[in-house]
């Protein structure tokens, strides 16, 4: 597990509130990006230590296994308190430093529409850090300014109306294997604490089927972008 400031440069930076959030939402897209030669770095914001299942050490081991299975370049952690993420200068500067170290073209972060307060806070934190990271005179000691050109948001515990849906049918089985690395979050004997009554693997499967059906495929991952995305070549839209 790398510290945020020592993360390597990459094409894609994925911000997850807790270990497993990035994989549940994005593993298929990340597998496809890497097939296309894109370098991916994962950055968890907390260690998930306040969750109902799994210790911080167990979840760290699961996150490392998932990262290896996914084949990403590196995985880091901001070390902010689980259930206590705040959008303050300290957290902002940690994330600004990470963005300037990784220097991604694409940033993936959680959508603010969520029942978990950490997800909402991380969404707001990402928005703030994304902007400030590009300012030349903001905390220059954190590195040269850099603002990811594309910033996509992914859903957590609530559905979103997506701007785009990525067809992940070709890698759906690989994604399922990655998500199953989070063994402490699978098949709990008591489901009363689960927001939607589903464990992480079940939630990923059902959501991918739902959004996949919306574009006529077996599995899809949804993303939201603030404003229209430019399309310079219409031909790929024809299939």
Language-model region placement:
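Active-site rim/loop-helix segments in enzyme catalytic domains that contact anionic ligands
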Residues: 1-102, 224, 234-239
């Amino acid at each position: 597990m790398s510290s945020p400031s020592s993360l390597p440069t990459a094409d894609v930076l994925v911000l997850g509130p807790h270990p497993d959030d990035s994989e549940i939402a994005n593993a298929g897209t990340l597998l496809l990006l890497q097939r296309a030669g894109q370098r991916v770095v994962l950055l968890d914001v907390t260690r998930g230590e306040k969750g109902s299942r799994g210790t911080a050490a167990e979840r760290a081991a699961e996150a490392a296994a998932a990262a290896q299975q996914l084949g990403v370049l590196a995985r880091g952690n901001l070390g902010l308190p689980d259930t206590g993420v705040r959008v303050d200068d300290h957290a902002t500067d940690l994330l600004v430093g990470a963005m300037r170290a990784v220097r991604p073209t694409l940033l993936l972060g959680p959508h603010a529409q969520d029942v978990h307060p950490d997800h909402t806070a991380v969404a707001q934190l990402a928005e703030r850090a994304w902007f400030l990271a590009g300012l030349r005179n903001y905390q220059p000691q954190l590195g040269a300014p850099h603002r990811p050109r594309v910033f996509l948001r992914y859903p957590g515990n609530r559905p979103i109306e997506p701007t785009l849906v990525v067809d992940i049918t070709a890698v759906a089985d690989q994604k399922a294997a990655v998500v199953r690395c989070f063994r402490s979050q699978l098949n709990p004997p008591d489901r009363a604490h689960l927001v939607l009554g589903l464990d992480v693997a079940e939630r990923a499967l059902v959501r991918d089927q739902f959004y996949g059906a919306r574009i006529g495929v077996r599995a899809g991952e949804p993303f939201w972008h603030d404003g229209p995305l430019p399309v310079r070549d219409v031909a790929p839209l024809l299939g």
